[in-house]
Curated annotation (Swiss-Prot):
It comes from Streptococcus pneumoniae (strain Hungary19A-6). This is Thymidylate kinase. Signal peptide: none annotated. PROSITE patterns: THYMIDYLATE_KINASE. The keyword Signal does not apply.
Length: 212
């Protein structure tokens, strides 16, 4: 059994997960928490190479099953090379996306079989699930508007998808929230960043048993 604490950050495009994480890190450091932050797909060399293939805007012909299997391959390598060692070392590991993204994007978004995705996630992770998942919820239109207004953000293949896909993805997350409400906590990402950070901090500290 791992000795650390695994947190995943989830949400539709433009929910602001990365900005919240950047604001949280100094707070955690003051608390003396040993933290590893990482992302999917990516996090390690092989994973980052797979990420480039998945998100390349020119790869418009990518089949949905190909996309899913690339994510799963990246997940496995990332887990064994980076995440599991950090958990064994007793660290707090915060992942920008994990298993729920596959269900939301490839399951609900692409229409692939949810049971097959669950099996692949189980196969890739040996059954590992986050201790806590923070789901940053935002209306699809607002999230995409944020992306369009952020000139510093690199546009990827998923950003170019139609509104319908993104709506299905959000519905997927809301379905997961209903199914696994004991693990997944919904955070209103439409609020000002400072409020979102404070809410996230409170939920995280409560989940880890840290004093606020």
């Amino acid at each position: 059994m791992s000795k650390g604490f695994l947190v995943s950050l989830e949400g539709p495009e433009g929910a602001g997960k990365t900005s919240v994480l950047e604001a949280l890190l100094p707070i955690l450091e003051v608390k003396g928490v040993k933290v590893l932050t990482t992302r999917e797909p990516g996090g390690v060399l092989i994973g980052e190479k797979i990420r480039e293939v998945i998100l390349d805007p020119s790869h418009t012909q990518m089949d949905a099953k190909t996309e899913l299997l690339l994510y799963i391959a990246s997940r496995r390598q990332h887990l064994v090379e980076k995440v599991l060692p950090a958990l064994e070392a007793g660290k707090l590991v915060i992942m920008d996306r994990f298993i729920d993204s596959s269900v939301a994007y490839q399951g609900f978004g692409r229409g692939l079989d949810i049971e097959a995705i669950d099996w692949l996630n189980q196969f890739a992770t040996d059954g590992l699930k986050p201790d806590l998942t923070l789901y940053f919820d935002i209306e699809v239109e607002e999230g995409l508007a944020r992306i369009a207004a952020n000139s510093d953000r690199e546009v990827n293949r998923l950003d170019l998808e139609g509104l319908d896909l993104h709506k299905k993805v959000r519905q997927g997350y809301l379905s997961l929230l209903e199914k696994e409400g004991n693990r997944i906590v919904k955070i209103d990402a439409s609020l000002p960043l400072e409020q979102v950070v404070e809410t996230t901090k409170a939920v995280l500290f409560d989940g880890m048993g840290l004093a606020k």
